Design a protein with these regions (language model features):
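C-terminal catalytic/motor cores of large multi-domain enzyme assemblies
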Residues: 1-240
């Protein structure tokens, strides 16, 4: 403040460096509190054998320069997007007490920001993109998210969100739905696990896939079929 005569005049100060982060945390808190207060969540988990996808990815990347290699995450995104064609009730919004089906499949991907906080912009029409297109667009999305240059449509258009904490070693993640969406899919870290295949014990690459869904829109039976569809699609990675 400066003093002019007998009156104190407030001088506008530059925002503190952490103001933006604090505002983001408050926005996240408000959205998540609203979600847990208003949305009757239910949760499902399904272990998916990624061994075939893992081998296909290794073989594919071995033939490519480093700059063109794929991450396994794009296979997960594509499988979820295609599974939504079979389970469209999870590709919807719930607005003003009614379910609103969405025509496009716009998969939001949760991205942690370096300074703290989280955004979940959309890969638009993810079901129509090749895995190579998804890889390029995902890398671009991450770069622009961390640079603060996302487009408004990328914030507002997600019809479902995928979250993954696999790179942090978490086995299973159960997400909180972003309103007005009606579902979130979570992936943990792939891990070697002893499994019985053809009556023999063998090591397989397993990943936990979870579903958080809105019970006003779907039920556990349909949720289970959705997770099974994701599993089935990942068994044929060359067709994604």
């Amino acid at each position: 403040n400066v003093i002019a005569g007998s009156k104190a005049i407030a001088v506008k100060q530059a925002p503190a460096p952490d103001d933006k982060q604090a505002r983001m945390r408050q926005a996240i808190a408000n959205a998540m509190a609203r979600s847990k207060r208003e949305i009757p969540h239910y949760y499902l988990r399904h272990g998916i054998d990624l061994t075939s996808a893992w081998q296909w990815l290794a073989d594919t990347n071995a033939k490519r320069p480093v700059t063109e290699r794929l991450l396994y995450g794009v296979l997960l995104v594509k499988a979820v997007a295609l599974a939504l064609r079979e389970a469209p009730e999870f590709n919807a919004w719930f607005v003003d007490g009614r379910t609103s089906a969405r025509s496009g499949i716009h998969v939001g991907v949760a991205i942690a920001l370096r300074g703290g906080g989280l955004v979940a912009p959309a890969l638009l029409d993810a079901d129509k993109q090749s895995v190579d297109q998804l890889m390029r667009n995902f890398q671009d999305l991450v770069q622009r998210a961390r640079a603060g240059s996302l487009r408004s449509s990328e914030y507002s258009e997600p019809t479902i969100t995928i979250t993954s904490l696999g790179d942090r070693g978490v086995d299973t993640v159960y997400g909180i739905i972003f309103p007005p969406q009606v579902a979130m899919v979570g992936f943990g870290a792939p891990r070697l696990q002893a499994c019985v295949v053809n009556n023999a014990i063998t090591a397989r690459q397993i990943i936990d896939c979870s579903l958080s869904a809105d019970h006003r829109v779907s039920d556990g039976h349909r949720g289970a079929l959705f997770l099974r569809a994701i599993d089935r699609l990942l068994q044929a990675p060359e067709k994604l």
